[in-house]
Curated annotation (Swiss-Prot):
NCBIfam families: PRK01816.1. This is UPF0208 membrane protein YfbV. It comes from Salmonella typhimurium (strain LT2 / SGSC1412 / ATCC 700720). The keyword Transferase does not apply. Coiled coil: none annotated. Residues 1-45, 92-151 are cytoplasmic. Its main location: membrane. Keywords: Cell inner membrane, Cell membrane, Membrane, Transmembrane, Transmembrane helix. The chain crosses the membrane at residues 46-65, 69-91.
């Protein structure tokens, strides 16, 4: 569930971890006030969809109007970097160990899943945000939606 040493994660594997984390995180409105992931995932998906066409349009527009190539390329590269920044942030967040307050909440949610008869793999090392995302996704699928009220 968690990586033994969070600093040993390869730079490029953070992008894959970010994609996996974005797919795993439950996009529930009730989690939005506590976690920033809902907004970051939504904006990253938006950037993945719309920034490549914006970059191409900006580049073509500048070239067609006889503008300089340097600023046009810089603007296009900036537009293309926005989705990558979101995925990188999500990847870093996924391997970040949980702070103590969220850690207690994580174990309470796991306890509720076990009380409901769900088999859970034991937690290895200190849980990270990816483990929280996996647990929350499973809790929203398996438990009643009111499980957050009791926590």
């Amino acid at each position: 569930m968690s990586t033994p040493d969070n600093r040993s994660v390869n730079f490029f594997s953070l992008f894959r971890r970010g994609q996996h984390y974005a797919k795993t995180w439950p996009m529930e409105k009730r989690l939005a006030p506590v976690f920033v992931e809902n907004r970051v995932i939504r904006m990253t998906r938006y950037a993945i969809r719309f920034m490549p066409p914006v970059a191409v349009f900006t580049l073509c527009w500048q070239i067609a109007l006889g503008g300089q190539l340097g600023p046009a390329v810089a603007t296009a590269l900036f537009a293309l970097s926005l989705p990558m920044q979101g995925l990188w942030w999500l990847g870093k967040r996924s391997v970040t160990p949980l702070p103590p307050s969220i850690l207690n909440w994580f174990y309470e949610v796991r306890g509720k899943l076990q009380e409901a008869g769900q088999a859970l793999a034991p937690v290895e090392g200190k849980p990270d945000y990816q483990a929280l995302a996996d647990t929350l996704k499973r809790a929203f699928k398996q438990l009643d939606k009111t499980f957050l009220d009791d926590l």
